[in-house]
């Protein structure tokens, strides 16, 4: 048997978007892209909840709690970490990426990583809706595919 992700029958899905308030001008664009993508694939606006957290490092903690509640079919994580002149950038991106990875492996709720990690503000702007598309929209589609795969493999 071959199992392949499909973007079908998503109408009754409940989605959480966990978003960092830091660099909110970029993150708001990512959220818009994610919302539009989810709605284009049948998710009603009333089934999309946005949970704002102070910064990117708080995303994994809140995503874990949301997954534990088991109210949502999937979780999108969004943020923008832009490199500065200190090593803090590396600490933040490693903490966020590792945290989300651990949570996604330890829960039964699909979670996708949509935290931009860029060297410049311009790169973040390009990836949040300018030249390079909108990564929020892309990860939202990935989430819908994961939800579908999870549903298919329940019967294995």
Curated annotation (Swiss-Prot):
The active site is at 88 (proton donor). Keywords: Riboflavin biosynthesis, Transferase. One of its GO terms (molecular function) is 6,7-dimethyl-8-ribityllumazine synthase activity. InterPro entries: LS (IPR034964), LS/RS (IPR002180), LS/RS_sf (IPR036467). Belongs to the DMRL synthase family. (2S)-2-hydroxy-3-oxobutyl phosphate binds at residues 85-86, 127. This is 6,7-dimethyl-8-ribityllumazine synthase. It catalyses: (2S)-2-hydroxy-3-oxobutyl phosphate + 5-amino-6-(D-ribitylamino)uracil = 6,7-dimethyl-8-(1-D-ribityl)lumazine + phosphate + 2 H2O + H(+). Gene3D superfamilies: Lumazine/riboflavin synthase. The keyword Transferase applies. Catalyzes the formation of 6,7-dimethyl-8-ribityllumazine by condensation of 5-amino-6-(D-ribitylamino)uracil with 3,4-dihydroxy-2-butanone 4-phosphate. This is the penultimate step in the biosynthesis of riboflavin. The lineage of its organism: Bacteria, Bacillati, Bacillota, Bacilli, Lactobacillales. The keyword Glycoprotein does not apply. One of its GO terms (cellular component) is riboflavin synthase complex. Its EC number is 2.5.1.78. 5-amino-6-(D-ribitylamino)uracil binds at residues 22, 56-58, 80-82, 113. GO terms for biological process: riboflavin biosynthetic process. Pathway: Cofactor biosynthesis; riboflavin biosynthesis; riboflavin from 2-hydroxy-3-oxobutyl phosphate and 5-amino-6-(D-ribitylamino)uracil: step 1/2. It comes from Leuconostoc mesenteroides subsp. mesenteroides (strain ATCC 8293 / DSM 20343 / BCRC 11652 / CCM 1803 / JCM 6124 / NCDO 523 / NBRC 100496 / NCIMB 8023 / NCTC 12954 / NRRL B-1118 / 37Y).
């Amino acid at each position: 048997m071959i199992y392949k992700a499909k973007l079908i029958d998503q109408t009754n899905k409940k989605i959480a978007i966990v978003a960092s308030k830091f660099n909110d001008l970029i993150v708001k664009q990512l959220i818009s892209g994610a919302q539009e993508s989810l709605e284009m694939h049948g998710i009603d606006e009333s089934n999309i909840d946005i949970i704002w957290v102070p910064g990117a490092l708080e995303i994994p903690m809140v995503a874990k709690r949301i997954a534990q509640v088991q109210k949502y079919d999937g979780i999108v994580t969004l943020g923008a970490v832009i490199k500065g002149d200190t090593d803090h950038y590396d600490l933040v991106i490693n903490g966020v990426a590792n945290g989300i990875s651990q949570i996604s492996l330890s829960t039964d709720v699909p979670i996708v990583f949509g935290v931009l990690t860029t060297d410049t503000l311009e790169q973040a702007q390009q990836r949040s809706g300018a030249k390079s598309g909108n990564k929020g929209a892309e990860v939202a589609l990935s989430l819908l595919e994961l939800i579908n795969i999870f549903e298919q493999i329940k019967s294995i």
